[in-house]
Amino acid sequence: PGQLSSRAFSHEIHGVRGLALTMVVAFHLFGQGRVSGGVDVFLVISAYLMTGSMIRSLQSGKLSLVRRYGKTFSRLLPPALLTIVFTVVVGLMILPRSRWLGLFEGAQASSVFMENVYLGTAGLTYEAAGDSASPFQHFWSLSAQGQFLILWPLLAFLILKLFSRISGDTRVRIFFGFTLVATGASFLYALLLVGIDQPVAYYSLWARMWEFGAGALAAFIMPWLQSLRKLFVGALGWMGITLILSSGFLIDGATKFPGAWALWPVMGAVLVLVSADTGGAIDVGLTRVLSWKPIAWLANRGYALYLWHWPLLVYFLSVKGQASIGYLGAAAVLAASLILSELSTRYVSAPAVRGANGALTSPAGSGKLLAILIAAAVGVAAL
């Protein structure tokens, strides 16, 4: 693998990431329990961006785990912890005492990125929103992402330390080889586990690792694709968008993912990434669509929207005593979710990121920031 582009920001990638999260919300509210495939797209993109950063670190020989973790979790944790506290407080007011233990266990697991493990070991299947659903169920994907974002830089760091005397390009090749093997092994494991116990596979990091691996492999091979004709890769981008948008309508992801059918949204995400980072998206109008102001607005608030919508939906159904939500109720939950996502993005996420950027300028500041984040997560879990 060659030198990966260090382009600081991609409107196409940012847009499709926001589109993926918005799809998840839309299908939860209006899709009658169907899985959109948006989470799978989000996992691919997360791995692509993280792997690109790790490739550059391996080539330069410089990687601070403290700074990397501080940067990553200063973005993820503050809005997540706010949502968790809100969910617990409101849950204690409206849920029966018989559900309090599950509420606390879900909050603890979600605070430390272990909700997927909790759901899997508890034998809880993925279910559509209902008055008995866990208000923390949606944290399973954030937990899997958090686990990956801890393990992947650690792997790159170990490669850097173990092979410090060889060239940066050789270190990248070692990283690539490990990624290739891990992705293939995870895909085979997912196929096997889906056939044996699909609900466990749905939440498993190891069964989902191949989706992260697809994004990671895309980051490795991207330099080789720069010479492709722009119109060709632009067309691939539109094909990718089609795969992403159609996934939830054509595939029953709740019972088939993360098996072979998950290739549908995963490959869609990879095609969009190829189109975006080879410049083909510009020539065919895809960049214009994905940087359209409404999509950009949703992308900037997509993470917060994802965090807020599920507990609001579950609590709405609990208060109403309903097993499913109508269109008017869904619209009301969506409106409330958009308002809370705007407020939390403006007054929690943005200040946290700005403060973290200042702290990350020095090793001491990075260490203090990471310590604060860990203490906050453990503190919320302990409550």
What are these regions (language model features)?
Residues 361-383:
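Internal/C-terminal transmembrane anchor helices
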Residues 1-360, 367:
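Membrane-interface helix/loop caps of multi-pass membrane proteins
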